[in-house]
From Swiss-Prot:
Subcellular location: Plastid, Chloroplast thylakoid membrane
Organism: Daucus carota
Subunit details: NDH is composed of at least 16 different subunits, 5 of which are encoded in the nucleus.
SUPFAM superfamilies: HydA/Nqo6-like (SSF56770)
Keywords: 4Fe-4S, Chloroplast, Iron, Iron-sulfur, Membrane, Metal-binding, NAD, NADP, Plastid, Plastoquinone, Quinone, Thylakoid, Translocase, Transport
Binding site for [4Fe-4S] cluster: 43-44, 108, 139
UniProt-listed Enzyme Commission number(s): 7.1.1.-
Cofactor info, note text: Binds 1 [4Fe-4S] cluster.
Listed InterPro entries: NADH_UbQ_OxRdtase-like_20kDa, NADH_UQ_OxRdtase_20Kd_su
Name of this chain's protein: NAD(P)H-quinone oxidoreductase subunit K, chloroplastic
Length: 225
């Protein structure tokens, strides 16, 4: 009488089993399929357009550009943001579903760039309107730098906890479009007063009524008035 022989477990079985958590699985799925909304207002956006070509091929990162904010979870702001465009940018961000991310591309988006010294209508940094996850400096940044920024964002997504991110955004978001403009006497002669123009940023001089805590949904009209 032949005895019943049970098949031995394959040694490769342990390599084919994946153990993870729901949070890690959610992060992996989101970082592998980012759908960006392209918000370009100046020359920096031309550098991002070169990523669509075959030389850089940003499709390999799972990026699918969308034309509607309701279908996007990433917005790339490139170029100068003016006071008149500020409500539109905030409205686009509010229409994006959670979780959503922001990459500030270029010097004009991050700090106002060369227009921040003598322009009354330039927003001194897009982070005064919406929260920024990755800052990408440059004038303009190279396509390789854009890929590096997307890679850093993917690493950030892989380590985050969704509940903590939503709580942090609702408690720490502040908005303001009121910026002080001080014009020096020699600003049009090429002799800039560095101590006068480049002052350290401080929020203590800004009246508290210009800031709005993001504890509830705030309309775009309330953010700029």
């Amino acid at each position: 009488m032949n005895s019943i022989e049970f098949p031995l477990l394959d040694r490769t079985t342990q390599n084919s089993v994946i153990s993870t958590t729901s949070n890690d699985l959610s992060n992996w799925s989101r970082l592998s399929s980012l759908w960006p909304l392209l918000y370009g207002t100046s020359c920096c956006f031309i550098e991002f357009a070169s990523l669509i070509g075959s030389r850089f091929d940003f499709d390999r990162y799972g990026l699918v550009p969308r034309s509607s904010p309701r279908q996007a979870d990433l917005i790339l702001t490139a170029g100068t943001v003016t006071m008149k465009m500020a409500p539109s940018l905030v409205r686009l961000y509010e229409q994006m579903p959670e979780p959503k991310y922001v990459i500030a591309m270029g010097a004009c988006t991050i700090s106002g760039g060369m227009f921040s010294t003598d322009s009354y209508s330039t927003v001194r940094g897009v982070d005064k309107l919406i929260p920024v996850d990755v800052y990408l400096p440059g004038c303009p940044p190279k396509p390789e730098a854009v890929i590096d920024a997307i890679t850093k964002l993917r690493k950030k997504i892989s380590r985050e906890i969704y509940e903590d991110r939503i709580k942090s955004q609702r408690e720490n978001r502040c908005f303001t479009t009121n910026h002080k403009l001080k014009v020096g006497r020699s600003i049009h002669t090429g002799n800039y007063d560095r101590e006068f123009l480049y002052q350290p940023t401080s929020t203590s001089e800004i009246p508290p009524e210009t800031f709005f805590k993001y504890k509830s949904s705030v309309s775009s009209h309330e953010l700029v008035n």
